[in-house]
Each structure stands twice: as structure tokens, then as C-alpha cells.
Amino acid sequence: MSLVEEIERVGNIGLAESFIIDNKIVYGEIGDDIRSATFSPVIGYHTPSEMLDLVESRMYVGYHNPKHMKGIIARGPENLIEEERVKSAIKYAAETFDNKVYKVKHRTFDVMESKREKLDEFLNFIDMAMSGNWFKKLTMTVKSSGSPLKMSEKFYRLPFQQMLMLDVIVAMSARCDLGEYIGLILNYSKTILGLDNMSAEKINEIGERLKKNISGYIIPRRCGKSSFSGCMIALVMAMCPSAGIKCLYTAHKKNQCTDMYSSVEKHVVALIKEFNRINEAKFLELVNKYKARKKLYKGFYYKAAHTPGKKDGALVVSFYKFTEAGRNIKTTDIPMAVNEFRSIVYKQKDTHRGATYNLMFVDETNFLQPAIFNELFPMLNTDKAKMICTSSQKNGQDAKPFVDIRNTRQDGTTTCVVEYVCPNHCMSLIRQTNVAFTVCNCNIFSQPLHINAGAGVRKIMAAFSVKTNKNMEVDDDDDSKSTMLSEIGIMPPGLTKNDILGMNNLQNMRLTSELGRYHFLSKKSNVLKELLVEPDAYSKTVLLYLDPTPTSYRSVDSVTYDRSLHAISAIAQKKTGEYVVLGIEEFTTQKYEKESHDASKAMASIIMAQVTVIHKIYEHFNEFILIPEVNSFDLDNVWYNCGLLLREAVETTDMDDVSILAPCMITESENGTNGKAMFGKKRKIVSELEGKKVIEDPKTKKLRLEFDADGETNILDDYSDGMAKTLTELSTTFKELEHELKHSGKKYKIGYRMNGDKVGRFIDFFSNIFNRKKFTVAENLFSASLGATMEIELAEYLLEKLDNVVIRTDVNKRGKKSYSVSGKSSNKNQHCADDLAVSAVMATSLYNYYRDFKITPEEALIKLQPIYEQGSRL
């Protein structure tokens, strides 16, 4: 039996079987393991496999990809597909898809019989509202008597408008008692709703996510917030009879409410005409079809009429059921459904008390007194109500917002802040000239990551409209885009120090991103397990960075001791390149040497505790490189005390195979340094004349001799003595002095000196390591100083310190700009301690350099040796 005959045979047998032919053009060949799928025939979408993506079903033609519609064959329970069309599709599919046909089993219908009529009606509402260029006609108007609609312009829904549209549709499905079918509705209407690029699963997630009583939208000025809201209100009022809405629009200014009412009324008049025309035309078409079959059509159609508001400002749209085409609405007709709209300014408390609404648009929410919510919230508890809050950002003319929508995030609330920007688009927004484009279009919700890192919503406006003078009006400034980094609170991947050069107002720019923070806390490394599974999973080198705070001493009872806070971080690296924190310390030396007050000994104890514990726990790491930052602390003494403790560790534990290294700076000896300075200074006044050395004035090139009044040479006694001394000191020739300096002794000093590249290292760490998920902590994070005293987890404590690190811009009196890294400002002229964050960042930044270190004329690595006699320091 041929393929066509087989399909026709089976297709004529049952009502619960359909055939779907694989669309190789889009998805490729289906695997052998995928032979059947369950799908909902009402929308024509399968459940388990994206390969089977298109179905023509019982009564809804849901082509999701019309280009390949002939590749799909389906026979519904009422046999609605014409025979000729079936044969044509079968032939096309057999030739195009190499006879690959798969049988799909499905239920006959997924919608309750009592709700099929409502579903048809609601889908018709979506079709009418989304077609006919209504968004363009109702929003893109020119406010002048002689200008028509701007029909030549193309309308694009902004991301917030797309979300607002879906939000209203989901709310109306609930009002029409179809909330349980919202996934079905959105999937069926995906093309006209702009959801073509999304899978059925994702569309279902959108439907569930928007099932909230409250939604909040924070939108830049002049982006179509109010006009689009008015458009959606008018569409629902005129084309959704089953909703039975009582809609309220409220704002803080009377002219806004007046304009909204006028706009909605004008839109409703145009929409009702279209609604009545389409419904009557469909009714007549069905009547004629039934007449051709010599049957009587017993259906009906809706016809709408509106009543303008009077004193109470209510606009009423009434819907009447008619079974006769062309009939006019009479005053005696009883409406089958009514939609009402009111636009009321909120001037004082209790303005909205007593009324009942089930769809509320609260415009410019940031400017309204918060008492309004006490009046509106109770309405959300009944009758499947919905409240949509929209607002622009506060500007600099207002001290603070009345309502911070950002803080209303809760289970029953959906928020959409349009300024949400993903990291990949962050830099492109900053670099462009026009700061008005603040929306990232990579996501339908425009919110892959959050903007507004801890600041109030009112600061967002200032981020893009910086005032150079506080007394001036808010205007766009050339520096507006530069402040975006500090307001969005995220670190774009690949950002370098050069990207922020030239930017002003970089205040408290947070460096950590939400993606990096999530990875840091949720993807902790089980180092022991990883080493058991793969012994070479980690490098054998651990780098410890010591950030000793410049010593601050305090005197109590005639005893002086160090009160500074010091920090250490121990970092290892996986062979995959990811960095793992094995241990952290944050301590004061007084805590460990309360009697002797020996700060160096206390610091050495903490260092050796980290080394010993990490070596014993993992039995893998055998090279520890200590990087102590050079400042006023006596690091040589710390190194000496580490040698004493190493002797004890070697004698009592198995530490023979452990190497502890530290960088040291190589400098000239004291004699060599002084000699070089003397050589450079005196070279200016020494010259060789015929093999002898004489003193001459370097300016006049004359002998420095003084004369008496009678012309005789008179060398003063003190000058004579000084010249004699100078001649004695310069008895060495130039070549002899140069040779002596070249072969003078070297001086070695323990420590690492940061060469002014701190900002660059921090930007590189957060941009290319932390925010790219290459930095995490060990599950067994060790800390001798913090382990027993911390109220929160050590990893969270370290993350808190990293969160507090910010980039700051300082401009001196001369206008010279400089960038610095510090802890976030807590109080006036005070900053959060950043020592632990600095140690973690620097340990990671320097890891590869010192692990693969090669000696240079300025720096070397020296190995710690056990010290057996306290009298000698090696």
C-alpha cells in the first residue's frame, strides 16, 4: 500500500488519530525514538517534542509557521478538512519529506464543552484587537487639526508595551472565566501576539507569570506609556463583551485624566464601528452557508453601542445580542453585557472609596500619595480584579518618591522596570550618543538583570539627565551616559579601564553582577571529591595574598598595641581555569597576642595556620606563595616569625614536602644608593683638565675663585676648607666610581608593591573572572579568625565584601581626574572595609604570574627556611 493510500485509510477510520509529517526544513530529521506525541488539538501544539510543531485541528486553524503549512496533515473529529486539500497536502509532504510520516495520538478536545463558546469569543477578541493596525491608528497621531494619522510610519511595540499587552490579555482571560486556558490561548494566538520565536513551554510560563493581581511598570518619559494604556483600555472596552469590566484610570493631575477620557472615548467610537461591522459580516456569512445547506442558523452576534459619561465621568459600552442582521439597537433592548470606564483625578484621601472596579490603571504612580493603595487594594480581593501601575521616574525637582514601585515586589506583584539592561548590551548603550535609548531589546520583558543597585527609583532619572548645577532644571548632559554604569549596578563583560576613562560621576559603581553572585554561592566546589575523582583537577599551587592595613596603634593603660584590621585570602585554580577560594582571614593581631602585643608574631600564626590546614585537609597542595602587600607593616619580621613556626611544623607534622615562597624586591645596598646619588650630583661640577681635577662654576664655566678689591685672589678659609674636602671626595675617577656602583651589594626586601594598577586589576577580575562564572569558593572554606564567630556563612560574608567594592571618581582642584577602588560609602567620609575583598581580588589577579614566576632584576621569589635559632634571621 502506498503512503498516500495508507494515510487516507487510517485518516478515514478514527477520530482520535492524526498524522504529522516531519518538517525537515525547520528542524531536521526526527530521531527513531520519537514516534508519537500528545498534543492539544484545539491549538495544534504538541507536548513532548519540538519536532512536531504544527497541526491543523478540530475547529481552529493554528498554523504557527505558515511557510511550511503543507507539511502538516491532521484530521479532527468532525472531519473539517476538505478531501482535495488533504490529498494535495499528502502529495506535497510525500515528495518533500521523503515519506517520513508519524502518527500522533491525541484527545478529541481539551476545553470543557460549556466554555467552548467563550473561548471562541475571546479568540475573536484577540484577533480583532491585534489586527487592523489598531496600535498604530490609536497611538501614532499628530495633535493638530490639519494632520492626518501618520500612516506612513511603522509601529513597533516597545518591550514594555509588549508585556503590558500580554498582561491585559491574561487579565481579561481571567475576567472571561478562561484563566485555566491561558496557555492554550497564547499558544494558539502566538503569531498575532508577537510570540513566534517562543516555544510552547515558554509561552505557558509567560501566561502563568502574568497571573498576578498587580503589575508595575517604570518607563522613561515620552515612550508611549499613557497612550498605549489608553489604547488597551479602548480595545477591551469596545471588543471584549464577556469581560464585564469596570475600569478606572487615575493620576495626580486633572489634565491627565481629562485627556485620557477624551482619548479613550474617541478610540471607542472608532472601535465599536469596526466591532459591529466584523461581527455582522461573520454572522451573515454563517447564515448564507446554512441557507445553502437548507438549514437554519440559530446563532447570534454582538452589537455594541456607547453612552458618553456625564457628571460622574463614566463611559459605558453596552453589548446586545441579535439574531437578525441589520437590526438597529432600540432603547427597549436589554444589554447582555456592559463595560464601564471612569477617569478620576486623585486629589485627596478617600477619592476612590466606595466605588467598585475590576481593572485599574494607576498612572504616574511615583507621584501619587501612598494612601491611594489603601482604597484600591481591597478591590483586588474579589471579582478577579487587576491593577496596573505605570510611572515615569522621579526627576530632580522632587525630593523623594511617594511610592517606590521597586519595593513592592512580592508574590502577588509583577514588576517591569524598562531600564533593565543585560550585560552584553550595557556598553553599547553607554557608548552611544543618544542617551534616550535606555531599553535593552534582547528579552521580551527587557529584564535579564536588574538595574538600580540599591538606589531609589528616583535616582534613575538623574542617571540619564545629570544636572551640572543643582539649581538648574534637569537637562540632558554630556556626562549622562557615564553615570549609567553606577545606576545599572552591573559589570559588563569585557570592560576595561580604558572604557571608563573620560567618564564623570562614576560614584559607587557596583562591580558584582547577579549572574556572578548566583554562581559564587550556588556552585561551590567540593575540592576533596573532585581530587578523588581526578587527582590533577587542581594545580598544586596555592596563592595567599596578605593585605596588612597600615598600622594604627592604640594606647590603653600605658600599653600600645595594633588595632588595624588585616585580611588574607587563599586561592587555588582548577585546570579548567576556574579560581576557588580555600580560605579567608580577617583579624586584628591583638586578638592573638593579647599579652605580648607582638603584631608580627600574630600575623605569622594566621598565615601558617592557613598553610598547615589546607595542606593537611587536601593532601594535594604543596606549594604556597605568600604575597604580602608592602606598606608600613614590618613584613621582614613577619617572615622571620613564619620561619620559627615552620620549624615547629616540620618537627611535629609532615611538612617536609611543602614549599612556602614569597616575593622580594631587589634594591641597591645603602652604600651603592648613596654613591649613585653623589655621583650624579657632583658630576655637574667636575671636569678633567689635562689629567687634573679643578672646581669650576657649572653656569659660567669659570673657576670658582673670589678676588679682593685690589684684584688679588682671596680664598676664604671656610671656602678653602670646603674645596679641599670636595677635592678629597672626588679623588676617585669617573670610571672608578662607575665600577664601584655596578658591583655594589644588593638588598632584598620581602613584599609586593602595587604599581598603581589596582583599578585595572579590579575591573579585569570582575569583568573577566567573577561575572563570567570563573570564581567560587570551596565547600569547606577555612578561617581561623572568622570560623567560630560568624553569624552568617563565610561564603556569604566574602560575597558581601565583594559587593561593597566600588569604583569612585575623584577630581582635584586643578580638574585632574583619578579613579580609585574602595569600600562603599557608609557614612560621611567613611567607607566599608575592603581589605578582605582586596586580598581575594589580588590573589586571583596575581595567581598565574607568580605560579609561573621567572626571576627579574627587580624581583625574585625566596623560599622560607625553618629557623632553629631565634638569634639569627635568615
From Swiss-Prot:
Disulfide bonds listed in the record: none
Coiled coil: none
Transmembrane annotation, as ranges: none
Record-level GO BP terms: chromosome organization
One Pfam family named in its UniProt record: DNA_pack_N
Full protein name: Uncharacterized protein ORF109
Species classification: Viruses, Duplodnaviria, Heunggongvirae, Peploviricota, Herviviricetes
Gene3D superfamilies per record: 3.30.420.320, P-loop containing nucleotide triphosphate hydrolases
